[in-house]
UniProtKB/Swiss-Prot annotation:
Belongs to the ATPase B chain family. GO terms for molecular function: proton-transporting ATP synthase activity, rotational mechanism; proton-transporting ATPase activity, rotational mechanism. GO terms for cellular component: plasma membrane; proton-transporting ATP synthase complex. It is a single-pass membrane protein. This is ATP synthase subunit b. The gene is atpF. The chain crosses the membrane at residues 5-25. It is found in: Cell inner membrane. NCBIfam families: ATP_synt_b, PRK05759.1-2, PRK05759.1-4. The keyword RNA-binding does not apply. The keyword Transmembrane applies. It comes from Chromohalobacter salexigens (strain ATCC BAA-138 / DSM 3043 / CIP 106854 / NCIMB 13768 / 1H11). F(1)F(0) ATP synthase produces ATP from ADP in the presence of a proton or sodium gradient. F-type ATPases consist of two structural domains, F(1) containing the extramembraneous catalytic core and F(0) containing the membrane proton channel, linked together by a central stalk and a peripheral stalk. During catalysis, ATP synthesis in the catalytic domain of F(1) is coupled via a rotary mechanism of the central stalk subunits to proton translocation. Keywords: ATP synthesis, Cell inner membrane, Cell membrane, CF(0), Hydrogen ion transport, Ion transport, Membrane, Transmembrane, Transmembrane helix, Transport. F-type ATPases have 2 components, F(1) - the catalytic core - and F(0) - the membrane proton channel. F(1) has five subunits: alpha(3), beta(3), gamma(1), delta(1), epsilon(1). F(0) has three main subunits: a(1), b(2) and c(10-14). The alpha and beta chains form an alternating ring which encloses part of the gamma chain. F(1) is attached to F(0) by a central stalk formed by the gamma and epsilon chains, while a peripheral stalk is formed by the delta and b chains.
Length: 156
């Protein structure tokens, strides 16, 4: 085996090159790779956190939407109940007012009927007295006659 000085020189140059690379080139390259690896890992973690946060936000939004819909449904239901209650109250008030008006009208009719009966009795009594005076054409005691007519009128 012939070893040339060139081969030994190349081996020494290669060893110096390797040592130089290990000492000065390799650490910054490794540091850059580690920093890049850390950035990628941080980015993936951030993306994972963002995904979880997005899912959580979507769940919260869906829950709030559901609660809002339930509240809206409750408000609408309460409004319907209140409207129905107001309608029922108005119907009851109208019915009571109608009954009161009917009773008032009945009372007025009864009063008018009584007044008309009294007026009729008075007129009948006056006509009876006039008729009796003409028939008898005599003097009858006015007080007794009036008493008899009042009794007859009361019987009518």
């Amino acid at each position: 085996m012939n070893l040339n000085l060139t081969l030994i020189g190349q081996a020494i140059a290669f060893a110096v090159f390797v040592w130089f690379c290990m000492k000065f080139v390799w650490p910054p390259v490794m540091q850059a790779l580690q920093e890049r690896q850390k950035k990628i890992a941080d980015g993936l973690d951030a993306a994972s956190r963002a995904t979880r946060d997005l899912e959580l936000a979507q769940e919260q939004a869906a829950e709030q939407l559901k609660e809002s819909k339930e509240q809206a449904a409750q408000i609408i239901e309460q409004a319907h109940k209140r409207a129905n209650q107001m309608i029922e109250e108005a119907r009851d008030n109208a019915r009571l007012e109608g009954e009161r008006m009917i009773e008032s009208a009945r009372g007025e009719i009864e009063q008018e009927t009584q007044r008309a009966k009294e007026e009729l009795r008075t007129q009948v009594a006056a006509l009876a007295i006039q008729g009796a005076e003409r028939i008898l054409d005599s003097s009858i005691d006015e007080a007794k006659h009036r008493e008899l007519v009042d009794k007859l009128a009361a019987e009518l």
